[in-house]
């Protein structure tokens, strides 16, 4: 298994696909770079989802999140990109990604992006 940052998310079979249950994963080690100032942005990322057939392999998630540390991204962009990548890989029933960024310049930013599969097919809800 790799030990370097990677954009490759891995999935493993859900042991209870017949049941609706929620998985919550939190890390306070997320870092990216502000594309305007070049300064680091630190955030606590919380991922909540109801899986269908797949769950995320945690080490691959750690390396995926780590891959952003030297990349320039706005808060809203990176939160939605994380959601999109996880939804594409896991095909969950529902998922929410919350990025709670540390205060910079006196401003505290929290971005919440949601996805919910509907009877008509996938539907992505707007970021808060």
Curated annotation (Swiss-Prot):
GO molecular function, one term: preQ1 synthase activity
EC number: 1.7.1.13
Ribonucleoprotein in keyword set: no
GO biological process: queuosine biosynthetic process; tRNA modification
Subcellular location: Cytoplasm
Pathway listed: tRNA modification; tRNA-queuosine biosynthesis
Reaction(s) the record says it catalyses: 7-aminomethyl-7-carbaguanine + 2 NADP(+) = 7-cyano-7-deazaguanine + 2 NADPH + 3 H(+)
Cross-referenced Pfam families: QueF
Highest taxon above the source species: Bacteria
Enzyme class per UniProt: oxidoreductase
Keywords carried by this UniProt record: Cytoplasm, NADP, Oxidoreductase, Queuosine biosynthesis
GO (cellular component) term, any one: cytoplasm
Annotated catalytic residues: 34, 41
Binding site for substrate: 56-58, 75-76
NCBIfam families from the UniProt entry: QueF-II (TIGR03139)
Known role: Catalyzes the NADPH-dependent reduction of 7-cyano-7-deazaguanine (preQ0) to 7-aminomethyl-7-deazaguanine (preQ1).
Family, as annotated: Belongs to the GTP cyclohydrolase I family. QueF type 1 subfamily.
UniProt name for this protein: NADPH-dependent 7-cyano-7-deazaguanine reductase
Organism in which the protein naturally occurs: Thermomicrobium roseum (strain ATCC 27502 / DSM 5159 / P-2)
The gene coding this protein: queF
């Amino acid at each position: 298994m790799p030990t370097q940052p990677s954009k490759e998310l891995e999935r493993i079979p859900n042991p209870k696909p017949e049941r609706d249950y929620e998985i919550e994963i939190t890390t306070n080690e997320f870092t990216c770079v502000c594309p305007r100032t070049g300064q680091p942005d630190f955030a606590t990322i919380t991922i909540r989802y109801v899986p269908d057939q797949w769950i995320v392999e945690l080490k691959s998630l750690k390396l995926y999140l780590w891959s952003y540390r030297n990349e320039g991204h706005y808060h809203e962009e990176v939160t939605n990109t994380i959601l999109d990548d996880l939804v594409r890989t896991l095909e969950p029933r529902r998922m929410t990604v919350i990025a709670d960024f540390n205060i910079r310049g006196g401003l505290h930013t929290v971005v919440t992006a949601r996805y919910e599969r509907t009877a008509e097919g996938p539907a992505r809800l707007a970021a808060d």
